[in-house]
């Protein structure tokens, strides 16, 4: 049997999204189904969210006033009206299937129905830039832990524990892997291609990151340099700190890429450096929207003392010029008074002598 798929299923009821790495130049479609039992409060709550690449495009919530599959991307307005009726019915049917799954899991794990439990699945497909299929996946989780997953070959299953082996035997006998493989390799790909065409202005764009480095003193001897990348799409990006040209991967604190709230993404990477050695560190930013990688360093702010010196020098220069003008005017004034005549300005000069008087001490 193949290895279990990564533990990426999260409780989407809280709106969390774990971004799944994809190959550069590829596209993906993913669906997340979550059913949460709530004893004494009626039917389990059932939620579906669908993503094309990093953009949510559909959502269903059984707790809505009128539960329907809903549009979450503007370009989904291009689909025919019956699409929403069909997807709503599929969602309602799946909600009932998941209700049964929750009850079955209670028996398999010998648990009481008094507590709340969660059953989830994530499935989807990925295609190359030219639309060719290259990867599919389907995995299930119970109470936040792996339950069973379709292997990489899309022909067999891996169960996480003895309880899940009951499901594995049942699905192997029913040929469930073959059914899912057919969907992932064909129907999933066809829909993904269609969505990519409808939303190409959004989904196939490449917004470059706005990047900069900030400086945060940690102590008298150390400081933290943080490299920021903001406003980029798609989500795939690389931030690498280097010291004298050598990667500092082991010493870098790197946060997960996260949504920026406006359809773009943000990320940062930080490294602690000795004070005074900041200029030896550079941040390298690579993203599909950049014509070439960015190389950034921390730019120290202008020193206040240097600014003050510059201002003082400028003021002194102005005073020297004014002093020279005053001296010239005084000499001309004294020269005119000595001859006992009146000073008459040359033709074309200033006719208002008041400006000269204002310069006198």
From Swiss-Prot:
UniProt GO BP: antigen processing and presentation of endogenous peptide antigen via MHC class I via ER pathway, TAP-independent; antigen processing and presentation of endogenous peptide antigen via MHC class Ib; immune response; positive regulation of T cell mediated cytotoxicity
Region of interest (Alpha-3), ranges: 207-298
Record InterPro entries: Ig-like_dom (IPR007110), Ig-like_dom_sf (IPR036179), Ig-like_fold (IPR013783), Ig/MHC_CS (IPR003006), Ig_C1-set (IPR003597), MHC_class-I_related (IPR050208), MHC_I-like_Ag-recog (IPR011161), MHC_I-like_Ag-recog_sf (IPR037055)
Region Alpha-1, annotated ranges: 25-114
Keywords from the UniProt entry: Disulfide bond, Glycoprotein, Immunity, Membrane, MHC I, Phosphoprotein, Signal, Transmembrane, Transmembrane helix
Region feature Alpha-2, mapped onto this chain: 115-206
SUPFAM superfamilies named among the record's database cross-references: Immunoglobulin (SSF48726), MHC antigen-recognition domain (SSF54452)
Entry-linked Pfam families: C1-set, MHC_I, MHC_I_C
Domain of life (superkingdom): Eukaryota
Annotated S-S bridges: 125-188, 227-283
Extracellular side: 25-308
Parts of the chain on the Cytoplasmic side: 330-361
Position of the signal peptide: 1-24
Residues with PTM Phosphoserine: 355, 358
Membrane topology qualifier: Single-pass type I membrane protein
Function summary: Involved in the presentation of foreign antigens to the immune system.
Family, per entry: Belongs to the MHC class I family.
Protein name (Swiss-Prot/TrEMBL): RLA class I histocompatibility antigen, alpha chain 11/11
Species annotation: Oryctolagus cuniculus (Rabbit)
Lineage, top ranks: Eukaryota, Metazoa, Chordata, Craniata, Vertebrata
């Amino acid at each position: 049997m193949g290895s279990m798929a990564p533990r990426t299923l999260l409780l989407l009821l809280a709106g969390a999204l774990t971004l799944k790495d994809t190959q550069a130049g590829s596209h993906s479609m993913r669906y997340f189904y979550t059913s949460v039992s709530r004893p004494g409060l009626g039917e389990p709550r059932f939620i579906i969210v669908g993503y094309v690449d990093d953009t949510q495009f559909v959502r269903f919530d059984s707790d809505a006033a009128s539960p329907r599959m809903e549009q979450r991307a503007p370009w989904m307005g291009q689909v025919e009206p019956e699409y929403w009726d069909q997807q709503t019915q599929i969602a309602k049917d799946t909600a009932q299937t998941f209700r049964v799954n929750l009850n079955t899991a209670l028996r398999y794990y010998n648990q009481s129905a008094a507590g709340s439990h969660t059953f989830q699945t994530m499935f989807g497909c990925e295609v190359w830039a030219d639309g060719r299929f290259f990867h599919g996946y389907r995995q299930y989780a119970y109470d936040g832990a792996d339950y069973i997953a379709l292997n990489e070959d899309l022909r067999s299953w891996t169960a996480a524990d003895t309880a899940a082996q009951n499901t594995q035997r049942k699905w192997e006998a029913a040929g469930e892997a073959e059914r899912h493989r057919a969907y992932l390799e064909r129907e999933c790909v066809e829909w993904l291609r269609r969505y990519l065409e409808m939303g190409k202005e959004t989904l196939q764009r490449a917004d470059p990151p706005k990047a900069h480095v900030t400086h945060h003193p940690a102590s008298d001897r150390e400081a933290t340099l943080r490299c920021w990348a903001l406003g980029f799409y798609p989500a795939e990006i690389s931030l690498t700190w280097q010291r004298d040209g050598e990667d500092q991967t082991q010493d870098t604190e790197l946060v997960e890429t996260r949504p920026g709230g406006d359809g773009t993404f943000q990320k940062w990477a930080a490294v602690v450096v000795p004070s005074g050695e900041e200029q030896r560190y550079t941040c390298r930013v690579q993203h599909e929207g950049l014509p070439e990688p960015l190389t950034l360093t921390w730019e120290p702010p202008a020193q206040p003392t240097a600014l003050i010196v510059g201002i003082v020098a400028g003021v002194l220069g102005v005073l020297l010029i004014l002093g020279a003008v005053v001296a010239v005017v005084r000499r001309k004034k004294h020269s005119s008074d000595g001859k006992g005549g009146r000073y008459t300005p040359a033709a074309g000069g200033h006719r208002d002598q008041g400006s000269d008087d204002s310069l006198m001490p």
